[in-house]
């Protein structure tokens, strides 16, 4: 019957051009129409879809206007701004790593106006996907000049509350990591508590590391991610990567803050951060060696807060 055919087609899914790589077959099972409307561009690929979901996850964690640039499911650019100043968030997000922005996913949690579209055009930036809850008519006209760019208007930032993946001959499920650090989560453990400005940046940094592959370090200053290190097998290497990238793009780390998505097993990260001008640190805590990191922070007058929430991401 037509009903049986429809059910069978649903579970077989819609074929995608290919998977992560051209030699891998891929399908999407479900309805993308519930999440977004495609306004322009060619068919979405497997990589486009997983990166776009990652992008929505980042910007929807913020109440304030936020702009993120995603590459391989990692936030390589992220900034927040005041209401009506989303364009400033875009500029800061782009400046964090203009090289990695090439071929990335642009995501905003507010309407994209003409001013942002003009910037993207002037930068001659190639991007795979641009997604936002709304676009002005003029912005859309400008962005549509990019023939191959997929422009998506999201209907809802709500993502599935369960995450599913195959493992051996079975399936693993887990709850999505939806916790967002707030002021009530922060416990100052050093002699000097963070200033209001540092606290605001620490909360942004905590969101950033939540959306980076472990081991991850995020460096934030003035409401923007200025560098990050991710996917490293040691935490100190993630920090070294972040510092190197910040220096490469000309950022002054003096007054920046640092987030780690898991505890510091040794005080080496805090020591290196302080040596490079970082003034405040946020991490979950929970190491048997926490006190060594706290003592190191106190030695350098670095403020440290612990949250009790780890954000490993594999």
How would you name each of these model-derived features?
Residues 57, 183-228:
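Internal active-site segments that recognize and position negatively charged phosphoryl groups
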Residues 76-99, 218, 224-270:
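Glycine- and Gly-Pro-enriched alpha-helical subdomains that act as flexible
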Residues 1-176, 198-207, 214-216:
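Active-site loops and adjacent core secondary-structure elements that bind or stabilize anionic groups
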Residues 108, 122-153, 158, 266, ...:
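C-terminal binding/interaction regions
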Residues 32-43, 97-103, 175-192, 222-225, ...:
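Gly-rich Lys/Arg/Thr-decorated short loops/hinges at beta-loop-alpha junctions or inter-strand turns
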Residues 114, 118-122, 243-251, 273-275:
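Short, basic/hydrophobic alpha-helical segments
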Residues 101, 156-164, 178-187, 303-314:
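Short, basic, helix/turn surface patches
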